[in-house]
């Protein structure tokens, strides 16, 4: 199932929980397909300056993504053909920047 970033963060969080581990909730970033494996919700609605699917913050253990309502905080992902890993380990081999958009 492909993630529709225009949906509210709570709905996307529940989608990820319901589809993990299989079949998985997937998205595209920089031409690569990844499954989102673990998330949290931040209902702060002050993200109107961001596009849906846009990375708004990057920290060692999370990547925050603007959704249709609130932010989805990504903790664990699985790059196609690889093992599930925490977002920090993922970023050791895959560069993400604020402003990058999931779904593209």
Locations of regions flagged by a protein language model:
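An anion-binding loop in the catalytic cleft
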Residues: 5-104
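Flexible, acidic loop-helix segments that line cofactor/substrate-binding pockets
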Residues: 1-3
């Amino acid at each position: 199932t492909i993630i529709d970033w225009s949906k509210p963060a709570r709905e996307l969080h529940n989608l990820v929980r319901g589809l993990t581990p299989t079949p998985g909730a997937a998205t595209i970033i920089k031409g690569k397909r990844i499954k989102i494996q673990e998330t949290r919700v931040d209902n702060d609605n002050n993200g109107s300056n961001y596009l849906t699917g846009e990375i708004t913050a990057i920290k060692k253990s999370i990547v925050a993504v603007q959704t249709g309502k609130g932010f989805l905080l990504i903790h664990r992902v699985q790059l196609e053909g690889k093992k599930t890993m925490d977002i920090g380990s993922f970023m050791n081999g895959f560069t993400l920047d604020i402003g990058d958009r999931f779904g593209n």
